[in-house]
Every structure is written in C-alpha cells, then in structure tokens.
C-alpha cells in the first residue's frame, strides 16, 4: 500500500514546478505599476508653514493598510491607520505642529494622499523624510523628499567715518543678519578698495550673520563718493542693492577766486573769495599778506576779502588760511595794481557779445534761406504738376472754324500783266464747305516754279478756235513775279511757324493764292503766245 501510494518520478508533470515562479513574476509585474510620487526637495521658511506632498499612484483596487512618515534615522514622525486614525509618536513632532492634510481621525477611509503639513517650522526640522505606503497585496511603497529650512536675512549698510591717512582702513560696512543659508555680499565701487567678510551666529538658532567691511586708503577725493553693497540670497527674487556715501575727514583744501587781472587805481568794491573744500567744514578763516602789512582799504569778512578802494597798498600778495577739526589749509593770490583799466577785458567782452550777435544773425539768415529754398521747391513742384496736366489734356490752341476762315477778307490774287493797265487773276482761292478737312488731300509742301518759269511766256487765255498766243514778258510782269515769290516765302514761313505751334493747324490750312494756278485745270493755246 505504501509503495503504491508513492508515484514514480517519471509520472510528475514537468510544468508543475514552474507555476509558482510564474505567479510570483506576475505579482511583481503588477506591483511595479504602483508608485509613490513625492517632490525631491521642498523649501520652507523658518517659522512658517510648509507641506510635504505624497501621493500613491495610480488609483487601483489595492487597499492601503497604513501610511507613515519617518526621518532618515528611522524616527517615526507621523502615522495613519484606517482603523486607529492618526498618530504622532515623537514629542518633537507633536500634533500641534504636524498634521495630515487629507486624513481625518474619525474616518476609516482609504488614504492615498498622505501630504504632511509642518507649522512653526524650526531649523531642526530640516532633513530627509520618507513617505511609506503599506498596501495589500503588493506590499510597501515609499518615496523620499528633502525638507530645507531657509531664513531670509535682514540687511543694512553704513559708512565708517575715517580720517585721511596712509594706511588702509574700513570706510564702509554691510551686514546681513539671520540668514540661512548665509548671504553673499559683494561691493560695487570705482575706488578700487577691497572687502573682507566675517561670519557669526544669528539671533535664531541655525542662522548666520555676515559682516562685510570695505577698506581703502582714505584720501580727500574719496569723501562723498558712493559705493554699493550687493546682497544675494536664495530667498530674494533679485539681489538687494544698498548705496553708501563715504565720509573721509581731511583738512581744508583752499583756493582764492575773484581776481580778474584788472585791478587798477581807484577801482571800488573789489572782492576776493576763499574757496574751501574740507570735511568737516572750516571753523575759521584768516586773511593776511606776505609783506605783513594789511591794506587799510581791505576788510576781511569771513571767507571774503572786500577792498573798498584799490590803492598802491593793495599791490601785494594776499593769503587765506582756513582751519577745521582735522587741520589747516592756505592759498595765496598775487594782486597787480594797474595805473588805468585794462582794455583787454572789455575787448574780450565785446568780442563775446559780437560773436553772440553774429551767431544770431547767421542763424536768422540760414533760417531765411531754408524757408526760401523750401518755397521755391514748392512752387517748382506746383508748376511741374500744372505742366503735366496741360500735356495730358487737349491742346489749348483752337484753330478757326472753316466758316470763320471763309468770312475773313479775301486775299488779293496774283495778278499778271496783260497790258499797260489791264490785270487778270490767274486763280482764285477755292474751298468746298461740304468736304471735311480730313477728306481733302492738301499737300503740306508745295514745289514752287523757278524764276525762269515765272518769267517765261504767260498764258493769257485758252480757246478752241485758234492757236495759242505767246506774249513776251514786260517789266511789269517780272516785277509782279518777284513780288509773288516774296509773298510765297512769307506764307511758307508762316505755315512752318504754325506747324510748330500746333500740328493740328496743318490739317485746316488752305492753299495760298500764289500757287492756286498749279491745281486748276486750264491751258492756253500756243496761238495765244505773243
């Protein structure tokens, strides 16, 4: 019986040992789809409130059995159980300061949003926190986030009053108090000094105070110069700039003004001024001369010396001495008294006035020229526009109508001499009013007969009864022909002139009487020639 109960190894199915392994792989594959989403870093201000987000993704049918928050060293900060609610086991992280944003102690609902809120953030709250979900049946899923506690510093800058000297000393100080992390301080200056920073604990635990001192060799020219303290911190959207005006104490630097090299005998109310630059301000002014003799007409009035009347005693060297808390400074001014006023100054003044007047006149002339040029250009543009309109439109010249032409007084015909007192016209002007000018074939140019042809035998008449008669030309005939040639030349010149004025006139021109005989059909028999 026992032997029959034991199956031989050869009858075992080869796939049975692989089934547990396959189920385990499928379970792990499904579990890998579930993850915890947290932020890698969260910053919170000291004394403020901050939230640490933590979410279980994606939404599944898995049941969350517990959620816990713990530090990197394993200290449990907060816990939530669907049945037992919220728990804060560490006294440092009490329920007065910590809370779950979505969870409620009275609810046993499934919790997939485990966001934890801190109130009254402390420096010791900074560190790594692990959000852990215990799920069934996939097990535990976790995410780690780093909480950083920062403190915004308070900043101010001030000048350090120093006295002029050969050694480098601190002339300005910039302080950034209570920063976490420490602030970074730099200086912006054109004086070429150097900065030195020191660090000390802040008022609150975990904060730092930075003190930066700007140093240089104090000189008089550094007094009143502005330098800038630049403070950078990650809690600032942009750096903070703090300007500082340096204060360097130095003795008076003195100069004298008011002498114009035109002090002459009899000049009244001449003034010398003692100009002083110092820190602090001078407390005393003293006027004297190098000769030790002070002119009776000169009166010292603080920083000014008033000379009521210039005399030969004023021809000396005046000294102004100024004193302040640091030291004393002095300056000298040589006075040269002239016998009479100098004209150099007047000439210079006149030159200046003349130059100003000349500049005004030149400006006025230039402005006038510009206005004239603009007006001329404007007129030229208007004239060009008018000419363009005239060219585009019909011609302005209108020739006389044929009717008006016919009504003009008839020109005398060319006469030819037949005898001593008889004259007969060869041809009269002809115009057909029924035919338009465009239909008539009018030659523009006419070939005139030569002088020999004009002076040859003349045609006196035509008859079919006998031969033509030849008549030798007499003196009157030759004279008439020459007059006819002159008239024809004048007519040709007039036609050319009219053609140049308006080409349309040529279409309405009429043949002149002098060449009318060329187009008329008649003949004279040879028997008529004399």
UniProtKB/Swiss-Prot annotation:
The modification Phosphoserine is found at residue 424. Residues 1-31 form the signal peptide. The chain crosses the membrane at residues 352-372. The keyword Coiled coil does not apply. Residues 382-407 are annotated as: Disordered. CDD domains: Ig3_Nectin-5_like, IgC1_2_Nectin-2_Necl-5_like, IgV_1_Nectin-2_NecL-5_like_CD112_CD155. This is Nectin-2. It comes from Mus musculus. The lineage of its organism: Eukaryota, Metazoa, Chordata, Craniata, Vertebrata. The gene is Nectin2.
């Amino acid at each position: 019986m026992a032997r029959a109960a034991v199956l031989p190894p050869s009858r075992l199915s080869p796939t049975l040992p692989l089934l547990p392994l396959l189920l385990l792989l499928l379970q792990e594959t499904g579990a890998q789809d579930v993850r915890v989403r947290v932020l890698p870093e969260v910053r919170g201000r000291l004394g403020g409130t901050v939230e640490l987000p933590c979410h279980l993704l994606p939404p599944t049918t898995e049941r969350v059995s517990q959620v816990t928050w713990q530090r990197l060293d394993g200290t449990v900060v907060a816990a939530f159980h669907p049945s037992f609610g919220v728990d804060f086991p560490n006294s440092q992280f009490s329920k007065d300061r910590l809370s779950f944003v979505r969870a409620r102690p009275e609810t046993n609902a499934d919790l997939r949003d485990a966001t934890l809120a801190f109130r009254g953030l402390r420096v010791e709250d900074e560190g790594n926190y692990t959000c852990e979900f215990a799920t069934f049946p996939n097990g535990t899923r976790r995410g780690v986030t780093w909480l950083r506690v920062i403190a915004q510093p308070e900043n101010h800058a001030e000048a350090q009053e120093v006295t002029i000297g050969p050694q480098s000393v601190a002339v300005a100080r910039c302080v950034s108090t209570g920063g976490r992390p420490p602030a970074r301080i730099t200086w912006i200056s054109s004086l070429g000094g150097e900065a030195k920073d020191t660090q000390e604990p802040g008022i609150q635990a975990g904060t730092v105070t930075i003190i930066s001192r700007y140093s240089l060799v104090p000189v008089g020219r550094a007094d009143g110069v502005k330098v800038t303290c630049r403070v950078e911190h990650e809690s600032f959207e942009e750096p903070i700039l703090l300007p500082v005006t340096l204060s360097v104490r130095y003795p008076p630097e003195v100069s004298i003004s008011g002498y114009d090299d035109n002090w002459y005998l009899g000049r009244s109310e001449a003034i010398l001024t003692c100009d002083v630059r110092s820190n602090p301000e001078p407390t005393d002014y003293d006027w004297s001369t190098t000769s030790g003799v002070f002119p009776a007409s000169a009166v010292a009035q603080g920083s000014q010396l008033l000379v009521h009347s210039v005399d030969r005693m004023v021809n000396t060297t005046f000294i102004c001495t100024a004193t302040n808390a640091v030291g004393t400074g002095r300056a000298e001014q040589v006075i040269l008294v002239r016998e009479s006023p100098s004209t150099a100054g007047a000439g210079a003044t006149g030159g200046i006035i003349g130059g100003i007047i000349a500049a005004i006149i030149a400006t006025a002339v230039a402005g006038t020229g510009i206005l004239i040029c603009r007006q001329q250009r404007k007129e030229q543009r208007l004239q060009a526009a008018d000419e363009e309109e005239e060219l585009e439109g019909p011609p302005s010249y209108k020739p006389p109508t044929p009717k008006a032409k016919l009504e003009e007084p008839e020109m005398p015909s060319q006469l030819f001499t037949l005898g001593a007192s008889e004259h007969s016209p060869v041809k009269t002007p002809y115009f057909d009013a029924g035919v338009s000018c465009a239909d008539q074939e009018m030659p523009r140019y006419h070939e005139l007969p030569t002088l020999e042809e004009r002076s040859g035998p003349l045609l006196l008449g035509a008859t079919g009864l006998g031969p033509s008669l030849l008549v030798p030309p007499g003196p009157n005939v030759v004279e008439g022909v020459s007059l006819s040639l002159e008239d024809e030349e004048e007519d040709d010149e007039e036609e050319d002139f009219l053609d140049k004025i308006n080409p349309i006139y040529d279409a309405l021109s009429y043949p002149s009487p002098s060449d009318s005989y060329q187009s008329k059909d008649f003949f004279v028999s040879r028997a008529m020639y004399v």
